[in-house]
Regions:
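Bacterial N-terminal signal peptides that target proteins for export
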Residues: 1-9
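Sec/Tat signal peptide C-region and signal peptidase I cleavage site
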Residues: 20-26
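Non-transmembrane domains of secretory- and envelope-associated proteins
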Residues: 27-134, 268-301, 305-306, 313-318, ...
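Solvent-exposed N-terminal domain segments of exported/luminal and surface proteins
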Residues: 32-244
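Extended, compositionally biased non-globular segments
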Residues: 326-391
Length: 456
């Protein structure tokens, strides 16, 4: 183990040091590239020292979190200072599906960005396999790699996830407390892609697409809490990048379907803390933000979790999950500012793992540029979404099995588990199973009539 640990840390240090600028090239670079190199060099130095100070088997808590400040976001650090813990394990490679790798090799060479930062000539796979940090479009390319990640390519279903929301604080005797105010259970969350399909026919596109959408998503009906029973939403994301998403919210108690604006997608609904655009790290339109690359460096992330259901942290009363974290060789740090008037956040600072093109955490800032929220995502890799299920994938896939959103200013948090804590035998995730899978639904499930019918 000692020899293996030394190898992992050496590799991480080498990755960090590779970010430092080459003095012999500095004079030939434009000013923005010099600034990027300077920032990367400083980040690399801090990350190198921090990486050398940790090893697998360590537990990061509020007593020693300062030594990894350069390896986590300010939001993650705030969560640890509140009582969360990070158990350090060795780095492990993220498996990428063979079909996705083949599509990347076949199509990526033809992909470009237009003047509005929309993808052109993309068919399937990773749009930009290699990103030059000195490219003025680097941040946009990183976000498109995330937007077209291998996480799912055809369809996605989540059955019976549950979530709790409430205040977290120290009680009168100093005990960390998470006071749950509401418990949420939703029947289904489904997402159907019409483009970039790799695993089941029709592929790479669904030709029958009268709504001209890239994907459709449904989240309904809510089963709990009782006063929100039947509430749900349906969203369409269109092929045309200039067209706003259509998101319809149905509330049975007033028998009303309401259309949400793009700005309202940043609002946290029903007394909990996550907004529609924060699911998965970022679920908004990529061309509708101005993106800037802050840097790249090794950082810690939770990408190979072991616990199902996720392990609740006792140190903060249970508002976060105490899971395995590893030193990832390269994490991109990207800042995004919405072009939409009235958006709730002044900026999002998003951390994207280069190998997986996944977002393990992101920090959200208020209109005064103060840190407001942190989104923490726990990911695991397996050929089964849950060991109890009766189906397996031919390859390992990634599954988000837990996430937490902390409102650091209000002292309020929402945690979710997939599968839900009350349904430990449930698969939870159904990823790329195809239109003929037993749990599949007809196309008209993604519609307002279906939304209303399910909510009655």
């Amino acid at each position: 183990m000692k020899h293996r640990t030394s190898f992992i840390l050496t590799a991480a240090l080498a990755a960090a040091c590779s970010l430092a600028p080459n003095p012999s090239l500095a004079e030939t670079k434009p000013d923005h590239a010099k600034a990027a190199d300077s920032h990367a060099g400083a980040a690399a130095a801090g990350a190198s020292a921090a990486a050398a100070a940790i090893k697998p088997g360590d537990v990061i808590n509020k007593g020693n979190v300062d030594k990894v400040s350069d390896l986590i976001s300010p939001g993650v650090k705030a969560a640890v200072l509140n009582g969360s813990e990070l158990s350090i394990v060795p780095y492990a490679k993220i498996p990428i599906p063979k079909a996705y790798i083949e599509a990347t090799e076949k199509y990526s060479g033809q992909v470009t960005l237009d003047d509005k930062n929309d993808l052109k000539n993309w068919v399937a796979g990773r749009p930009f396999p290699t990103v030059d940090p000195n490219d003025p479009k680097a941040a946009v390319k990183i976000m498109w790699n995330f937007g077209r990640t291998s996480y799912f390519n055809d369809d996605l279903g989540v059955h019976l996830p549950d979530a709790d929301t409430g205040a977290y604080f120290k009680s009168g005797d100093g005990k960390p407390t998470y006071q749950i105010e509401r418990h949420f259970i939703v029947d289904w969350s489904r997402n159907l892609r019409f483009f970039g399909r790799l695993h089941h026919d029709p592929r790479p596109i669904i030709p029958d697409n009268p709504d001209q959408v890239f994907n459709k998503q449904g989240f309904f009906p809510l089963i709990e809490p009782f006063d929100l029973k039947g509430v749900g939403s349906v969203s369409f994301r269109y092929i045309d990048p200039t067209r706003q998403d259509d998101t319809w919210l149905y509330t049975p108690t007033i028998r009303r379907v309401r259309r949400l604006s793009s700005a309202q997608r940043s609002d946290a609904l029903f007394g909990q803390d996550i907004d529609l655009d924060s699911f998965g790290g970022y679920a908004g339109q990529i061309p509708w933000f101005d993106w800037k690359l802050i840097g790249q460096k090794p950082m810690l992330a939770s990408l190979h979790g072991k616990n199902l259901p996720p392990k609740i942290c006792p140190g903060d009363g249970g508002v976060t999950y105490c899971e395995d974290w590893e030193l990832r060789p390269k994490m991109w740090i990207v800042e995004g500012r919405a072009r939409v008037h009235g958006y709730a956040y002044s900026k999002r600072v998003i951390y994207v793992d280069d190998e997986a093109s996944m977002i393990p955490y992101s920090d959200l800032f208020d209109n005064n540029e103060e840190l407001w929220k942190v989104v923490l995502i726990n990911i695991r890799s397996s050929n089964q979404p849950n060991p109890h299920v009766d189906f397996k994938y031919d390859e390992e896939r990634m599954f988000v099995y837990g996430f937490t959103v902390l409102d650091l200013q209000l002292g309020h948090g929402t945690r979710a588990a997939i599968p839900g804590m009350a349904f430990p035998e449930e698969p939870g995730w159904y990823i790329d199973r195809g239109l003929q899978a037993p749990e599949a639904v007809p196309m008209d499930w993604y519609s307002i009539p279906s939304l209303i019918a399910a909510g009655r």
